[in-house]
Amino acid sequence: MSLLDVEGLRVRLATPNGAVTVVDGVDYSVESGEVFGVAGESGSGKTMSMLALLGLLPEGAVVDGTARFADRDLLRIPRRQLRDILGREIGMVFQDPMTSLHPMLSIGRQLTEHVEHHLHLGRRDAEARAEEILHDVRIPNPAAALRAFPHQFSGGMRQRIAIAIALACRPRLLIADEPTTALDVTVQAGILRLLDRLRREHELAVVLITHDLGVMSSIADRVSIFYAGRVVESGLRENVLQRPRHPYTRALLDALPHPEAAHERELVAIGGSPPAPSAIPAGCAFHPRCRYTQDSCRTEVPLLVAVDDRTLACPVDPLA
């Protein structure tokens, strides 16, 4: 059995103009020790699908489906039990560590309070664990770092500290939401190497949410591509990214710069914009932007079905 099994996940959010569906029937699973990549443009539903599991959606949100984590349905258990799981068994790393870290509290206080609450350790043991995890994520001079404040660190170091807090209680699953977006390329590579090392050393499952297929290609074992609240293609990284079979996946890859081929190919922008959740077009949601649109694409919603080495929601193969 997978560590996390999500089936039929639907999320509706309340807006001034009525409820809108932002996640529409999503299925996926995550295995222990793997990195599961979730990619798509802004507004594709990738982050909302994870926040739904953790009870972190805005007030008034309606969530349907099942999300079984270690034999418990995260969508059905009491909120108090869910809060205990979040932090102890599931860690979360957000995009901007400057907003996820409290600017007025020392790093030591933020780490030790987290450990004391979830692991019920005394102050001395909590401080020892805090220093240990800072060392584990390669923070120089961990003892001094515990006395410092977030603004005293670079963006890359702050993100390492955020990862340390998320992993301080030795969770089984880490959800990392765009953890490298605000970082330069060199620091980004260091964070990805850190996540890869930690998951191998601790048999940690990682859900990596990103809009950058380049990031995902460097670390993910399996990937799911989201568009307009649905999964359109999913499978092993090498299959999906080396031979994409959904036009949207193909378009994302065509728009990705390849330094080694900078003088041999032009970047191809994806025409148009992702639809707003309140204005999803009929048929395939991607058809207004697709180079391979057929008449049926305008009226029929493609089902996500198993096709050879992946699951796919499109009858057209852009590489055929």
Q: In which residue ranges do the predicted regions lie?
A:
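The feature captures the beta-strand-to-loop junction immediately N-terminal to the Walker
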Residues: A39-G40
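P-loop NTP-binding/switch modules centered on Walker-like glycine-rich loops
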Residues: G55, I175, P179, L183-R265
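Conserved ABC transporter NBD signature motif
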Residues: V62-D73
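ABC ATPase NBD coupling module
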Residues: L74-G91, R109, H117, N239-P244, ...
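Hydrophobic anchor residue at the start of the ABC signature
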Residues: L111, I163, V187, I191
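A short, proline-enriched helix->beta-strand linker immediately N-terminal to the Walker B motif
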Residues: A168-R172
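Charged, flexible cofactor/metal-binding loops and thiol motifs
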Residues: L236-A320
